[in-house]
Regions:
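Acidic, histidine-bearing metal-coordination/catalytic regions of metal-dependent phosphoesterases
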Residues: 1-55, 60, 77
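Well-ordered alpha-helical segments embedded in enzymatic catalytic cores
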Residues: 12, 67-71, 243
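Extended active-site neighborhood of metal-dependent phosphoesterases/phosphodiesterases
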Residues: 16, 24-40, 98-243
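Active-site loop signature of alpha/beta-hydrolase-fold enzymes
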Residues: 44, 62, 91, 152-153, ...
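Residues at the C-termini of beta-strands that transition into short coil/loop
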Residues: 45, 57, 86, 147, ...
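Conserved, compact domain cores that house catalytic/ligand-binding motifs in diverse enzymes
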Residues: 49-141
Length: 245
């Protein structure tokens, strides 16, 4: 499948593997004559069994994300799943935010985008001068993400990524529930339109948001306006609320 809602062509390949056994099934991916390392597919943990989950969020191509994921994976060892409550990337309709810099960026470019880090093929130099690669997680265990405000693009157009894009990929609503061993995961779409709470009289100098509270209301949350809102309603009677109850 070619995903057109990106700033460059992105292709998605999907395969279904059944009959997985407890010992796991080794696999590799071959594309354009290049073969990946060997990874492992395992069946879902049995209901009620103990599991080890890695919870992370707000990656957004930050300088130390690769180091954090590499060190966390080394410290906790093998996990059964990765849970991400939002903000996987910075700008969702930039392919580079998901897959890494364009090849034209050169061999020395920093690689600290979402998938390279979660696949252990990043190249991100931390403040200590050491280069970190992240960890090979999503090739071996499932990823359960939630949509954060950074996954919601602000402009709908022929080449922009939107909530519809995620539905096209998964075929599902942006909220879901799943059982992982002895854990019941309930994921809602409650991403919030973020706004700052600073006050600046000059609109051109407002770095975080063009909209702001009145000076007299900044210290009183009860008087704040509606510039900060949840993208998908969870009010009583809404589709998401009906599903949850």
């Amino acid at each position: 499948t070619r995903l057109t809602r990106m700033d460059r062509a992105v292709h998605r390949h999907r395969a279904r593997v059944g009959g997985l056994q407890a010992g796991g099934l080794g696999y590799r991916v071959i594309s354009d004559g290049q073969a990946s390392p060997r990874f492992t597919l395992r069946p879902a943990p049995g209901k009620g069994s103990g599991v080890r989950l890695l919870i992370t969020s707000d990656h957004q191509a930050k300088p130390h994300t690769a180091a954090n994921m590499e060190l966390a994976a080394a410290m906790v060892g093998p996990v059964d799943a990765v849970i991400m409550p939002g903000d996987l990337v910075n700008s969702p309709d930039r392919a580079a935010d998901w897959f890494g810099p364009h090849p034209s960026a050169g061999d020395d470019a920093e690689i600290r985008q979402f998938l390279p880090i979660m696949q252990g093929r990043a190249r991100s130099t931390a403040a200590n001068g050491r280069a970190y690669r992240g960890a090979p997680l999503v090739q071996n265990v499932p990823l359960y993400p939630a949509i954060g405000n950074h996954e919601v693009s602000g402009e709908l157009g022929p080449s922009s990524c939107s909530i519809d894009s995620y539905r096209q990929i998964t075929g599902a609503r942006p909220w879901y529930a799943v059982t992982i061993g002895n854990v019941r995961l309930i994921t809602l779409f409650v991403a919030r339109m973020w706004r700052g709470f600073d006050v600046n009289a000059d609109p051109r100098a407002r770095q975080r948001s063009r909209y702001q509270e009145a000076s007299a209301d900044v210290g009183d949350p009860q008087r704040h306006g509606q510039g900060c809102f949840i993208h998908e309603s969870i009010a009583p009677g809404s589709p998401q609320w009906q599903w949850l109850v």
